[in-house]
Design a protein with these regions (language model features):
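Structured catalytic-domain cores with a bias toward divalent-metal coordination
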Residues: 1-258
Length: 258
């Protein structure tokens, strides 16, 4: 207790500024946590994020969340669409995989409202994205829905349909796909890889309006890497590396976009 008292620093505004100063010219800041759902930490993390945005010019928040779910938040803070009257409405509608204390909580809602207000008069708006890979089926759904509504992308639509058809027998349960891939060599590797490759080859054909181009490619990237993750999880501990590699790849994609 004496050592803690001697060396610890209260996480007040002045000491948060010291952290910001120590960050210097870093392009990526990773804010870890000891446990999910801790109100005090979520609040401190939000305050530090605000300082990095306001004082250091950081352009986006990337969280350990699903891409489709966080897109609802991204659209809300950038004013792209009205998917809820308040940030809390958006969060409650968008996040279903984990308990509400994970992302659909008061602290994230408060930060989301702040970010929306901060973005109002900015030409280059701050983004909010998810870089995890658990949304295998949701991401394929998003790609298929978008391409089905834009028939001019027929080649990419055919690839998306093949990927959807390949996963359809598993009833939207990734663990069923993992078991099948492990024991019967039923795999959808080529389908999701072909989809991502096709979208990247045609990326110039997609509009940047409301980040249409980024959204469709990132959902395909999630599908490709999620397939690898679930296929490997039954037979090899390296699936956790696959998840980490995906997060790094997602961050690089976002940095290129910005």
């Amino acid at each position: 207790i004496q050592a803690i008292s001697q060396h610890s620093l209260p996480l007040n505004d002045a000491n948060l500024n010291k952290i910001v100063d120590a960050i210097g010219n870093a392009k990526i800041v990773m804010i870890g946590e000891a446990s999910h759902g801790t109100s005090e930490f979520y609040t401190i993390r939000a305050e530090l994020s605000k300082k990095l945005i306001e004082q250091q010019g950081f352009q986006l928040i990337a969280v350990e969340g699903d891409w489709p779910s966080t897109q609802a938040v991204n659209r809300y803070v950038k004013g792209y669409s009205v998917e809820g009257a308040t940030a809390k409405d958006v969060l409650m509608k968008a996040f279903h995989r984990w308990p509400t204390w994970m992302w659909a909580n008061e602290e994230v809602a408060t930060f989301t409202e702040w970010l929306k207000e901060f973005n109002i008069n900015r030409e280059e708006k701050i983004g909010f994205y998810g870089i995890d890979l658990y949304s295998l089926f949701e991401s394929i759904d998003e790609v298929l829905k978008f391409l089905s509504n834009n028939p001019k992308h027929q080649v990419d639509l055919e690839h998306a349909k093949k990927a959807f058809t390949c996963f359809e027998p598993y009833n939207r349960m990734p663990e069923h796909y993992a078991l099948s891939a492990a024991h019967f060599s039923d795999e959808c590797i080529s389908e999701v890889a072909s989809l991502l490759r096709s979208l990247r080859n045609h990326k110039e054909q997609y509009s940047s309006k409301e980040e249409e181009d980024l959204n469709v490619v990132m959902n395909a990237l999630v599908a490709k890497n999620a397939e690898s993750y679930y296929r490997e999880m039954m037979s090899d501990e390296k699936s956790w590396n696959t998840r980490d590699y995906h997060m790094v790849e997602a961050i690089h994609e976002l940095r290129k976009y910005y």
